């Protein structure tokens, strides 16, 4: 049972960074709804599995960090702000075009709690960042494929599997910093060269979005 719970928790945590590659063409907003529904479902499975795992093994229980009470305070403030807003229902649930309401924020909080409780070593965080960077590289290469006509869309402004050039720019910007962080911590020239190549691909892709991610 414990092995199954560990597989669900770690598998789900490392599956989330791959979601930018997922597009659900059967939905009305294929670039938004598919990713968000998948994110919510995965987080709920991961969180439920983590609760059971933490009850049976103390090492998976959360350690104190100011990030969690700060994030929790934000949730409380946002709850009352949404409740007292002009459109509380939309504030809580958002819509299918954006899907960024309070429900999504709660799921992000749950994901953060599990990440902080389970990824407790530098090696695990390194694996996680490398997974995210690998996904970003695939997203970038797909976007460059759009420019060359290999894939549809994004000929003028690269949007890749995100469907929005502005979102693509922000996504690239974050991962440029992730790559820089990994390069600075690298101890071999081979790895530094590899990170530099990946970083250049991401920077070039960022420029091809036509925006700067701000």
Predicted regions and their residues:
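Short strand->helix junction
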Residues: 6, 206-209, 213
């Amino acid at each position: 049972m414990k092995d199954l719970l560990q597989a669900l928790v770690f598998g789900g945590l490392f599956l989330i960074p791959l979601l930018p590659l997922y597009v659900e063409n059967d939905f009305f907003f294929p670039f938004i709804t598919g990713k968000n529904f998948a994110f919510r479902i995965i987080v709920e499975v991961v969180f439920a599995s983590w609760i059971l795992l933490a009850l049976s093994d103390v090492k998976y229980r959360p350690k104190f960090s100011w990030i969690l009470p700060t994030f929790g305070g934000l949730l409380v403030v946002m709850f009352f702000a949404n409740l007292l807003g002009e459109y509380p229902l939309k504030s809580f649930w958002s819509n299918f075009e954006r899907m960024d309401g309070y429900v999504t924020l709660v799921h992000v909080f749950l994901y953060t709690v599990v990440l902080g409780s389970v990824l407790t070593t530098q090696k695990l965080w390194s694996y996680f960042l490398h997974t995210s960077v690998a996904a970003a590289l695939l997203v970038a290469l797909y976007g460059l494929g759009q420019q060359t006509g290999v894939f549809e869309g994004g000929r003028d402004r690269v949007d890749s599997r995100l469907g929005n050039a502005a979102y693509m720019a922000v996504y690239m910007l974050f991962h440029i910093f992730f790559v820089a962080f990994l390069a600075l911590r690298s101890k071999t020239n081979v790895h530094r060269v590899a990170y530099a190549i990946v970083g250049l691909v991401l920077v070039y892709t960022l420029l091809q979005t036509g925006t700067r991610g701000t």
